[in-house]
Amino acid sequence: NALGMLTSGKVHLNISRDESAELFTKAKNVQINKFSGPHPAGNVGVQIHHIAPISSKDDIVWYLNAQNVADIGEYLSTGNYPNEKIIALGGSSILNPVYLKITKSASLEDILEDRLTLKDGIRIISGDVLSGETRLFNQGIRFYDESIAVIPESTEREFLGWALPGFSKYSLSRTFISALLSKKFTSFNTSMNGSHRAIISFGRWEDVLPMDILPEFLIKSILAKDIEEMEKLGIYECSEEDFSLCSFVCQSKTDVAGIISNGLQLAEQEG
């Protein structure tokens, strides 16, 4: 009801198809939408695309996560805005992945105390590992983030890595022997496993982007700074995090998500 007072539009509640909690499945005064599938099915941009696509720069959509809604409810009920939230702490440099209740202003040094496998040679990421932001020990988690990832910082390059069998390497295209072995957990680090090269169309971006968008043509229109073409190809429906998997799987080592971010900034500047 509180959210309905904040907007003249429809309030959508997006939940997992397997959700069983009646708090969500029987919520009133909202339109309930169910989603399933691997990442990025849970991204708000992907969900908006399938529920009510943004067709122009004049369309406005506000979104909140469950903890934000709970915070608003507590504020309206008690007059006090909560200063705590629950976050997920994970990554291969974390001793035991866990959920934590933290003070929103807590430093990462306090949060990570006695929880790291090592304190040097690591990258601390506020947000998810694909689209988060690198942080220092004396900084805190970003306001809207609900996770912290810590992974090893790669400082060495592997000579002729593409020619090695890759027993423990992840490969979307199944080009390493690891694809033939039994499934096991892969420990990721910050290595790009190669340098940037020309964009070659293999359809990898489309494989991991569950949106009715042509990512290759959109990226090229952004690089060409063609605003009109960007709008035709759906730039207003895009967000950086929705394309982070495209960056991860790109055989050309192209920062697809970064280009999308630049495209959105360019579209905003041009009005």
Q: What are these regions, as identified by a protein language model?
A:
Residues 1-271:
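Buried, small/hydrophobic-residue-enriched core segments of structured protein domains
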